[in-house]
């Protein structure tokens, strides 16, 4: 075997090549630290693999913020997340990094973000209308096209990382901890994204992937929303995940994909893949979800969930799909009738990847003794007596 066939992004290929080195060389980035005394933790919102997340108050202006306290991790990874957030700051529907603080004693870094008044997706997605789904998908695409145009792949698109303030119809794409700069020809770690949203390229260990990875993950989100099946591809491990995909997209196109890129499939797949025909999207429609499905929704989905990453729609192409015609028309009408306002800071619940939603906070008791609050205390952020008390 001569090794895999190289691949380059179809769009925004050389963005970082044309930028000055300091734009993408995050290892050399010098972090400017703010004052941790400006923030008081109020309650814990959740935890993830790499951090603990709190609602907090900025005592200088009394505004709610979200504080993401990073667990011990390589300095390089922290710098990457910070540099990416700084590069993307002000972009459409990108969570705003407000401050970076560190306790002088523990050296624990924490990222301070705008607050998003998020509704848990498991509750929210069950209530969304056809138009709502189109609207929010379009809002995610604005964020993705922007970050891709800035030479950045998110690499962890999933419902947990999309904060929606439904009352104000505001959306933010959060948790840029796995995001990376795209350099054509570079081989990347395939251990990114969450299992149910991993693209086939990750599952077959193809490392020369690009922005199109995010478009697969978005397709998985769309499928789960329109078919009311969460998650849509429900694998029990990374191998089974590809099997679940093959049972829908068929094995024939999978083998065409691995042949095209000269990918060597892990021998473990020999016993579990089998042979499967490509299923029609219509077979997933039933009485409970038919009000969310339309021919244009299925056509759009079909153009996202493609094995071949080069065949998927780009974020910009996706925004021009007929699925969004009504949304585009409405937004054009609104912007012509109202003064175009800037991006309003929004509010958040689970502010990062893999956060398990925390139940309605109980009065302080058990929370105060938690190692998280202890860690936060050592961070030099004073915890008010009412931390964790119900608002």
UniProtKB/Swiss-Prot annotation:
The modification Phosphoserine is found at residues 362, 370. InterPro entries: CK2_alpha, Kinase-like_dom_sf, Prot_kinase_dom, Protein_kinase_ATP_BS, Ser/Thr_kinase_AS. Phosphorylated at Thr-344, Thr-360, Ser-362 and Ser-370 by CDK1 in prophase and metaphase and dephosphorylated during anaphase. Phosphorylation does not directly affect casein kinase 2 activity, but may contribute to its regulation by forming binding sites for interacting proteins and/or targeting it to different compartments. ATP binds at residues 45-53, 68. Catalytic subunit of a constitutively active serine/threonine-protein kinase complex that phosphorylates a large number of substrates containing acidic residues C-terminal to the phosphorylated serine or threonine. Regulates numerous cellular processes, such as cell cycle progression, apoptosis and transcription, as well as viral infection. May act as a regulatory node which integrates and coordinates numerous signals leading to an appropriate cellular response. One of its GO terms (biological process) is negative regulation of double-strand break repair via homologous recombination. Disruption phenotype: Embryonic lethality at 10.5 dpc. Coiled coil: none annotated. Gene3D superfamilies: Phosphorylase Kinase, domain 1 (3.30.200.20), Transferase(Phosphotransferase) domain 1 (1.10.510.10). It catalyses: L-seryl-[protein] + ATP = O-phospho-L-seryl-[protein] + ADP + H(+); L-threonyl-[protein] + ATP = O-phospho-L-threonyl-[protein] + ADP + H(+). Keywords: Apoptosis, ATP-binding, Biological rhythms, Cell cycle, Kinase, Nucleotide-binding, Nucleus, Phosphoprotein, Serine/threonine-protein kinase, Transcription, Transcription regulation, Transferase, Wnt signaling pathway. This is Casein kinase II subunit alpha. Residues 36-41 are annotated as: Interaction with beta subunit. Residues 39-324 form the Protein kinase domain. Belongs to the protein kinase superfamily. Ser/Thr protein kinase family. CK2 subfamily. Can use both ATP and GTP as phosphoryl donors. Phosphorylation by casein kinase 2 has been estimated to represent up to one quarter of the eukaryotic phosphoproteome. One of its GO terms (molecular function) is protein phosphatase regulator activity. The modification Phosphothreonine is found at residues 344, 360. Its EC number is 2.7.11.1.
């Amino acid at each position: 075997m001569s090794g895999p066939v190289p691949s380059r992004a179809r769009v925004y290929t050389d963005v970082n090549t044309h930028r000055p080195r300091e734009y993408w060389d995050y290892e050399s980035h010098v972090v400017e630290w703010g004052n941790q005394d400006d923030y008081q933790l109020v309650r814990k919102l959740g935890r993830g693999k790499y951090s603990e997340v709190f609602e907090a108050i900025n005592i200088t202006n009394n505004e709610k913020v979200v504080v993401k306290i990073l667990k011990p991790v390589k300095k390089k990874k922290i710098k990457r997340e910070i540099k990416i957030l700084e590069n993307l700051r002000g972009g459409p529907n990108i969570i705003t990094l407000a401050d970076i603080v560190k306790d002088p004693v523990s050296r624990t870094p924490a990222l301070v973000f705008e607050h998003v008044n998020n509704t848990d997706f498991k509750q929210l997605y069950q209530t969304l209308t056809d138009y709502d789904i189109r609207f929010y998908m379009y809002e995610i695409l604005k964020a993705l096209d922007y970050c891709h145009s800035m030479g950045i792949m998110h690499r962890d698109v999933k419902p947990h990382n999309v904060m929606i303030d439904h009352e104000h119809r505001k959306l933010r794409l959060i948790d840029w901890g796995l995001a990376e700069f795209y350099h054509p020809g570079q081989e990347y770690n395939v251990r990114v994204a969450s299992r149910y949203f991993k693209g086939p390229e990750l599952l077959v260990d193809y490392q020369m992937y690009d922005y199109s990875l995010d478009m697969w993950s978005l397709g998985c989100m769309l499928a789960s929303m329109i078919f009311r099946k969460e998650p849509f591809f429900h694998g029990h491990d990374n191998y089974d995940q590809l099997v679940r995909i093959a049972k829908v997209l068929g094995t024939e196109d999978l083998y065409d994909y691995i042949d095209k890129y000269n990918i060597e499939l892990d021998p473990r797949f020999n016993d579990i893949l089998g042979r499967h025909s490509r299923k029609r999207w219509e077979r997933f429609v039933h009485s409970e979800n038919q009000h969310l499905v339309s021919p244009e929704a299925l056509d759009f989905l079909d153009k996202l969930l493609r094995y071949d990453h080069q065949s998927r729609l780009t974020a910009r192409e996706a925004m021009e799909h007929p699925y969004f015609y009504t949304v585009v028309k409405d937004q054009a009408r609104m912007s012509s009738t109202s003064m175009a306002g800037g991006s309003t800071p929004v509010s958040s619940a689970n502010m990062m990847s893999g956060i398990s939603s925390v139940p309605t906070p109980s009065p302080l008791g058990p929370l105060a003794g938690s190692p998280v609050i202890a860690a936060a205390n050592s961070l030099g952020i004073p915890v008010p007596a009412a931390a964790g008390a119900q608002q």
